[in-house]
Protein backbone atom coordinates (compact mmCIF):
# COMPACT_ATOMS: atom_id res chain seq x y z
CA UNK A 1 0.00 0.00 0.00
CA UNK A 2 2.78 2.40 0.97
CA UNK A 3 4.56 1.64 -2.30
CA UNK A 4 1.45 2.51 -4.32
CA UNK A 5 0.98 5.65 -2.25
CA UNK A 6 4.57 6.75 -2.85
CA UNK A 7 4.15 6.20 -6.57
CA UNK A 8 0.95 8.29 -6.61
CA UNK A 9 2.73 11.08 -4.73
CA UNK A 10 5.61 10.94 -7.20
CA UNK A 11 3.23 11.16 -10.18
CA UNK A 12 1.40 14.06 -8.55
CA UNK A 13 4.69 15.88 -8.04
CA UNK A 14 5.65 15.33 -11.68
CA UNK A 15 2.31 16.70 -12.91
CA UNK A 16 2.62 19.77 -10.68
CA UNK A 17 6.20 20.34 -11.87
CA UNK A 18 5.16 20.12 -15.53
CA UNK A 19 2.26 22.54 -15.01
CA UNK A 20 4.52 24.98 -13.17
CA UNK A 21 7.16 24.77 -15.89
CA UNK A 22 4.58 25.42 -18.60
CA UNK A 23 3.16 28.37 -16.66
CA UNK A 24 6.61 29.86 -16.09
CA UNK A 25 7.52 29.43 -19.77
CA UNK A 26 4.25 31.06 -20.83
CA UNK A 27 4.78 33.94 -18.41
CA UNK A 28 8.34 34.46 -19.64
CA UNK A 29 7.19 34.54 -23.28
CA UNK A 30 4.45 37.04 -22.48
CA UNK A 31 6.78 39.26 -20.43
CA UNK A 32 9.29 39.58 -23.27
CA UNK A 33 6.70 39.81 -26.06
CA UNK A 34 7.32 40.72 -28.83
CA UNK A 35 10.90 39.84 -29.71
CA UNK A 36 10.41 39.66 -33.50
CA UNK A 37 8.04 40.90 -36.23
CA UNK A 38 4.38 39.88 -36.18
CA UNK A 39 2.32 38.65 -39.13
CA UNK A 40 -1.35 39.31 -39.77
CA UNK A 41 -2.64 36.78 -42.28
CA UNK A 42 -5.52 37.90 -44.51
CA UNK A 43 -7.57 35.46 -46.57
CA UNK A 44 -8.53 38.08 -49.15
CA UNK A 45 -6.56 40.08 -51.73
CA UNK A 46 -4.83 43.43 -51.31
CA UNK A 47 -7.37 46.23 -51.52
CA UNK A 48 -10.18 44.23 -49.92
CA UNK A 49 -11.92 45.47 -46.78
CA UNK A 50 -10.16 42.89 -44.62
CA UNK A 51 -6.78 43.84 -46.09
CA UNK A 52 -7.46 47.55 -45.49
CA UNK A 53 -8.29 46.99 -41.82
CA UNK A 54 -5.32 44.68 -41.27
CA UNK A 55 -2.93 47.26 -42.70
CA UNK A 56 -4.41 50.22 -40.81
CA UNK A 57 -4.39 48.37 -37.49
CA UNK A 58 -1.06 46.66 -38.21
CA UNK A 59 0.77 49.93 -38.89
CA UNK A 60 -0.34 51.31 -35.54
CA UNK A 61 0.32 48.08 -33.67
CA UNK A 62 3.90 48.22 -34.92
CA UNK A 63 4.31 51.66 -33.38
CA UNK A 64 3.14 50.48 -29.98
CA UNK A 65 5.00 47.17 -29.99
CA UNK A 66 8.28 48.38 -31.45
CA UNK A 67 8.27 45.54 -33.98
CA UNK A 68 7.32 45.34 -37.64
CA UNK A 69 3.81 44.00 -38.37
CA UNK A 70 3.66 42.31 -41.77
CA UNK A 71 0.35 41.78 -43.57
CA UNK A 72 0.40 38.53 -45.52
CA UNK A 73 -2.34 37.79 -48.07
CA UNK A 74 -3.12 34.07 -48.36
CA UNK A 75 -6.07 34.07 -50.73
CA UNK A 76 -8.26 31.22 -51.89
CA UNK A 77 -11.16 28.98 -50.85
CA UNK A 78 -13.19 31.88 -49.40
CA UNK A 79 -10.53 32.68 -46.83
CA UNK A 80 -10.24 29.16 -45.43
CA UNK A 81 -6.64 28.71 -46.60
CA UNK A 82 -5.50 31.64 -44.46
CA UNK A 83 -7.61 30.45 -41.54
CA UNK A 84 -6.05 26.99 -41.71
CA UNK A 85 -2.54 28.44 -41.77
CA UNK A 86 -3.10 30.42 -38.57
CA UNK A 87 -4.99 27.58 -36.86
CA UNK A 88 -1.87 25.40 -37.12
CA UNK A 89 0.63 28.16 -36.23
CA UNK A 90 2.58 28.27 -32.98
CA UNK A 91 0.47 29.87 -30.21
CA UNK A 92 3.06 32.52 -29.42
CA UNK A 93 1.36 35.71 -30.62
CA UNK A 94 3.51 36.17 -33.72
CA UNK A 95 0.93 35.05 -36.29
CA UNK A 96 -2.59 36.48 -36.18
CA UNK A 97 -5.65 36.12 -38.40
CA UNK A 98 -7.65 38.99 -39.84
CA UNK A 99 -11.06 37.34 -39.91
CA UNK A 100 -14.42 38.41 -41.31
CA UNK A 101 -17.99 37.27 -40.73
CA UNK A 102 -17.71 35.30 -43.99
CA UNK A 103 -15.65 32.71 -42.12
CA UNK A 104 -18.71 31.75 -40.05
CA UNK A 105 -20.41 30.39 -43.17
CA UNK A 106 -17.67 27.92 -44.03
CA UNK A 107 -18.46 25.09 -41.56
CA UNK A 108 -21.98 24.81 -43.02
CA UNK A 109 -20.68 24.91 -46.59
CA UNK A 110 -17.63 22.65 -46.33
CA UNK A 111 -17.68 19.21 -44.77
CA UNK A 112 -13.93 18.79 -44.33
CA UNK A 113 -12.54 21.94 -42.73
CA UNK A 114 -9.27 21.15 -40.91
CA UNK A 115 -10.06 23.56 -38.07
CA UNK A 116 -12.83 24.85 -35.82
CA UNK A 117 -13.36 28.58 -35.51
CA UNK A 118 -14.34 28.14 -31.85
CA UNK A 119 -11.88 25.43 -30.78
CA UNK A 120 -8.71 26.42 -32.63
CA UNK A 121 -8.58 30.18 -32.03
CA UNK A 122 -8.21 32.69 -29.22
CA UNK A 123 -10.32 35.78 -29.99
CA UNK A 124 -8.51 39.10 -29.54
CA UNK A 125 -11.03 41.79 -30.47
CA UNK A 126 -13.64 42.92 -32.90
CA UNK A 127 -12.44 45.85 -35.02
CA UNK A 128 -15.31 46.97 -37.23
CA UNK A 129 -18.92 46.38 -38.20
CA UNK A 130 -20.17 46.86 -41.75
CA UNK A 131 -23.60 46.92 -43.34
CA UNK A 132 -25.08 46.23 -46.74
CA UNK A 133 -27.77 48.03 -48.68
CA UNK A 134 -30.91 46.52 -50.16
CA UNK A 135 -31.20 48.04 -53.64
CA UNK A 136 -33.67 47.36 -56.44
CA UNK A 137 -33.63 48.10 -60.14
CA UNK A 138 -35.69 51.25 -60.94
CA UNK A 139 -38.21 49.13 -62.85
CA UNK A 140 -39.18 47.19 -59.71
CA UNK A 141 -42.44 48.73 -58.39
CA UNK A 142 -41.36 48.90 -54.76
CA UNK A 143 -40.46 52.04 -52.83
CA UNK A 144 -39.73 50.29 -49.54
CA UNK A 145 -39.16 46.86 -48.00
CA UNK A 146 -42.85 46.33 -47.22
CA UNK A 147 -43.76 46.79 -50.88
CA UNK A 148 -40.95 44.45 -51.98
CA UNK A 149 -42.23 41.78 -49.60
CA UNK A 150 -45.77 42.28 -50.90
CA UNK A 151 -44.50 41.75 -54.47
CA UNK A 152 -42.68 38.58 -53.45
CA UNK A 153 -45.79 37.23 -51.74
CA UNK A 154 -48.00 38.02 -54.71
CA UNK A 155 -45.63 36.26 -57.14
CA UNK A 156 -43.77 33.46 -55.28
CA UNK A 157 -40.48 32.53 -56.94
CA UNK A 158 -40.63 35.29 -59.56
CA UNK A 159 -38.45 37.98 -57.96
CA UNK A 160 -34.72 37.28 -58.08
CA UNK A 161 -31.59 38.73 -56.52
CA UNK A 162 -27.89 38.78 -57.32
CA UNK A 163 -25.41 37.19 -54.92
CA UNK A 164 -21.69 36.51 -54.97
CA UNK A 165 -22.19 32.84 -54.13
CA UNK A 166 -23.26 30.53 -51.33
CA UNK A 167 -22.49 31.91 -47.89
CA UNK A 168 -21.82 35.43 -49.18
CA UNK A 169 -23.37 38.38 -47.38
CA UNK A 170 -26.05 38.94 -50.09
CA UNK A 171 -26.93 35.23 -49.97
CA UNK A 172 -27.30 35.29 -46.18
CA UNK A 173 -29.23 38.57 -46.18
CA UNK A 174 -31.68 37.19 -48.75
CA UNK A 175 -32.01 33.94 -46.79
CA UNK A 176 -32.89 35.88 -43.64
CA UNK A 177 -35.33 38.07 -45.58
CA UNK A 178 -37.10 34.98 -46.94
CA UNK A 179 -37.18 33.33 -43.54
CA UNK A 180 -38.53 36.33 -41.65
CA UNK A 181 -40.99 37.50 -44.33
CA UNK A 182 -42.04 33.97 -45.33
CA UNK A 183 -41.46 34.61 -49.03
CA UNK A 184 -39.64 32.81 -51.84
CA UNK A 185 -37.17 34.60 -54.13
CA UNK A 186 -34.62 33.15 -56.55
CA UNK A 187 -30.85 33.45 -56.16
CA UNK A 188 -28.77 34.31 -59.23
CA UNK A 189 -25.13 33.68 -58.26
CA UNK A 190 -22.27 35.67 -59.78
CA UNK A 191 -18.50 35.36 -59.48
CA UNK A 192 -18.19 38.35 -57.18
CA UNK A 193 -19.88 41.30 -55.51
CA UNK A 194 -19.12 43.66 -58.41
CA UNK A 195 -20.82 41.40 -60.94
CA UNK A 196 -23.93 40.98 -58.79
CA UNK A 197 -24.30 44.75 -58.36
CA UNK A 198 -23.74 45.31 -62.09
CA UNK A 199 -26.53 42.82 -62.73
CA UNK A 200 -28.91 44.84 -60.54
CA UNK A 201 -28.00 48.03 -62.43
CA UNK A 202 -28.56 46.31 -65.78
CA UNK A 203 -31.91 44.89 -64.70
CA UNK A 204 -30.71 41.28 -64.96
CA UNK A 205 -31.88 40.81 -61.36
CA UNK A 206 -34.54 42.61 -59.35
CA UNK A 207 -32.50 43.38 -56.27
CA UNK A 208 -29.12 42.98 -54.61
CA UNK A 209 -27.21 43.75 -51.41
CA UNK A 210 -24.07 45.79 -52.24
CA UNK A 211 -21.82 47.45 -49.69
CA UNK A 212 -22.54 51.07 -48.81
CA UNK A 213 -19.55 52.37 -50.74
CA UNK A 214 -20.67 50.47 -53.85
CA UNK A 215 -24.29 51.59 -53.47
CA UNK A 216 -23.71 55.32 -52.92
CA UNK A 217 -22.70 56.34 -56.48
CA UNK A 218 -25.41 54.12 -57.97
CA UNK A 219 -28.04 55.69 -55.74
CA UNK A 220 -26.86 59.23 -56.48
CA UNK A 221 -26.95 58.58 -60.24
CA UNK A 222 -30.41 57.02 -60.05
CA UNK A 223 -29.24 53.65 -61.36
CA UNK A 224 -30.79 51.84 -58.40
CA UNK A 225 -33.36 52.56 -55.70
CA UNK A 226 -32.14 52.15 -52.13
CA UNK A 227 -34.76 50.61 -49.84
CA UNK A 228 -32.92 49.88 -46.59
CA UNK A 229 -29.69 48.95 -44.83
CA UNK A 230 -29.27 45.45 -43.41
CA UNK A 231 -27.74 46.37 -40.04
CA UNK A 232 -29.63 46.78 -36.76
CA UNK A 233 -29.17 50.56 -36.81
CA UNK A 234 -28.91 53.21 -39.52
CA UNK A 235 -25.57 53.77 -41.23
CA UNK A 236 -23.59 56.98 -40.73
CA UNK A 237 -23.08 57.36 -44.49
CA UNK A 238 -26.81 56.91 -45.21
CA UNK A 239 -28.61 58.31 -42.16
CA UNK A 240 -31.76 58.96 -44.19
CA UNK A 241 -32.12 55.30 -45.19
CA UNK A 242 -34.10 53.10 -42.78
CA UNK A 243 -33.05 49.66 -41.61
CA UNK A 244 -34.85 46.53 -42.79
CA UNK A 245 -35.86 46.10 -39.15
CA UNK A 246 -37.61 49.49 -39.21
CA UNK A 247 -39.26 48.64 -42.51
CA UNK A 248 -41.47 45.75 -41.51
CA UNK A 249 -39.14 43.00 -40.27
CA UNK A 250 -38.33 43.80 -36.61
CA UNK A 251 -35.10 42.19 -35.45
CA UNK A 252 -33.59 41.82 -38.92
CA UNK A 253 -29.79 42.21 -38.75
CA UNK A 254 -27.27 40.96 -41.27
CA UNK A 255 -24.15 42.95 -40.59
CA UNK A 256 -20.65 41.92 -41.45
CA UNK A 257 -17.75 42.23 -39.02
CA UNK A 258 -13.97 42.20 -38.93
CA UNK A 259 -11.67 41.18 -36.10
CA UNK A 260 -8.41 39.61 -34.99
CA UNK A 261 -7.81 36.05 -33.81
CA UNK A 262 -4.72 34.26 -32.49
CA UNK A 263 -4.12 30.50 -32.44
CA UNK A 264 -5.70 28.67 -29.50
CA UNK A 265 -3.50 28.37 -26.38
CA UNK A 266 -1.82 31.72 -27.03
CA UNK A 267 -0.80 32.96 -23.54
CA UNK A 268 -3.58 34.97 -21.95
CA UNK A 269 -1.13 37.78 -21.18
CA UNK A 270 -0.38 38.19 -24.89
CA UNK A 271 -4.07 38.13 -25.83
CA UNK A 272 -4.77 40.75 -23.15
CA UNK A 273 -1.92 42.95 -24.39
CA UNK A 274 -3.09 42.75 -28.01
CA UNK A 275 -6.71 43.36 -27.04
CA UNK A 276 -5.79 46.51 -25.11
CA UNK A 277 -3.77 47.85 -28.05
CA UNK A 278 -6.43 47.07 -30.67
CA UNK A 279 -9.09 48.74 -28.53
CA UNK A 280 -6.87 51.80 -28.11
CA UNK A 281 -6.04 51.98 -31.83
CA UNK A 282 -9.52 51.40 -33.24
CA UNK A 283 -11.24 53.85 -30.91
CA UNK A 284 -9.15 56.85 -31.96
CA UNK A 285 -10.97 59.51 -33.97
CA UNK A 286 -8.51 58.98 -36.82
CA UNK A 287 -9.45 55.31 -37.17
CA UNK A 288 -13.15 56.01 -36.74
CA UNK A 289 -12.97 58.47 -39.63
CA UNK A 290 -10.93 56.08 -41.78
CA UNK A 291 -13.39 53.26 -41.21
CA UNK A 292 -16.41 55.50 -41.73
CA UNK A 293 -15.18 56.49 -45.19
CA UNK A 294 -15.14 52.78 -46.02
CA UNK A 295 -18.71 52.33 -44.82
CA UNK A 296 -17.55 50.69 -41.59
CA UNK A 297 -18.21 51.47 -37.95
CA UNK A 298 -15.27 51.12 -35.57
CA UNK A 299 -16.24 48.73 -32.79
CA UNK A 300 -14.22 46.72 -30.28
CA UNK A 301 -14.93 44.30 -27.45
CA UNK A 302 -13.26 41.94 -24.97
CA UNK A 303 -11.92 38.51 -25.99
CA UNK A 304 -14.82 36.92 -24.09
CA UNK A 305 -17.41 39.09 -25.84
CA UNK A 306 -15.82 38.37 -29.21
CA UNK A 307 -15.95 34.62 -28.51
CA UNK A 308 -19.67 34.93 -27.79
CA UNK A 309 -20.23 36.93 -30.99
CA UNK A 310 -18.48 34.23 -33.04
CA UNK A 311 -20.49 31.47 -31.36
CA UNK A 312 -23.78 33.25 -32.04
CA UNK A 313 -22.80 34.07 -35.64
CA UNK A 314 -21.91 30.43 -36.34
CA UNK A 315 -25.29 29.30 -35.00
CA UNK A 316 -27.32 31.83 -36.99
CA UNK A 317 -25.41 31.42 -40.24
CA UNK A 318 -25.46 27.62 -40.07
CA UNK A 319 -29.24 27.72 -39.65
CA UNK A 320 -29.64 30.13 -42.58
CA UNK A 321 -27.43 28.12 -44.92
CA UNK A 322 -29.17 24.86 -44.06
CA UNK A 323 -32.49 26.53 -44.88
CA UNK A 324 -31.20 27.20 -48.41
CA UNK A 325 -29.60 23.79 -48.91
CA UNK A 326 -26.39 25.45 -50.16
CA UNK A 327 -23.12 23.50 -50.25
CA UNK A 328 -19.78 24.16 -51.91
CA UNK A 329 -18.37 20.64 -51.66
Regions found by a protein language model. Give the residues of each.
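Beta->alpha turn/N-cap motifs
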Residues: 98-103, 163, 193, 210-215, ...
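N-terminal (or domain-start) structured segment
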Residues: 28-119, 158, 182-211, 218, ...
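N-terminal secretory signal peptides that target proteins for export/translocation
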Residues: 1-10
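Short beta-strand->loop
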Residues: 114-126, 162, 184-188, 206-207, ...
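Bacterial N-terminal signal peptides
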Residues: 12-25
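An extracytoplasmic/periplasmic, membrane-proximal ligand-sensing/linker region
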Residues: 35-37, 180-183, 268-329
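Hinge/capping helix and adjacent helix->loop/strand transition within the periplasmic-binding protein
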Residues: 88-93, 108-195, 244, 257-290
Amino acid sequence: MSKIWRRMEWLRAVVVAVICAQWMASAAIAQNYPLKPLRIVVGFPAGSGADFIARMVGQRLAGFLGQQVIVENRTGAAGTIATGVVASAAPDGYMLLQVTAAEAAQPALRSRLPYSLERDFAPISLEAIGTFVLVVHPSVPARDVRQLIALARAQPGKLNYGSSGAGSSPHLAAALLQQMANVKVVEVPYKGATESVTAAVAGEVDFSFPSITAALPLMESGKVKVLAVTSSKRAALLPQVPTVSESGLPGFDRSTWHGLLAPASTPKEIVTTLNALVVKIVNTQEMRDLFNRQGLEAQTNTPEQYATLIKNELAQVTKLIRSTGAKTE
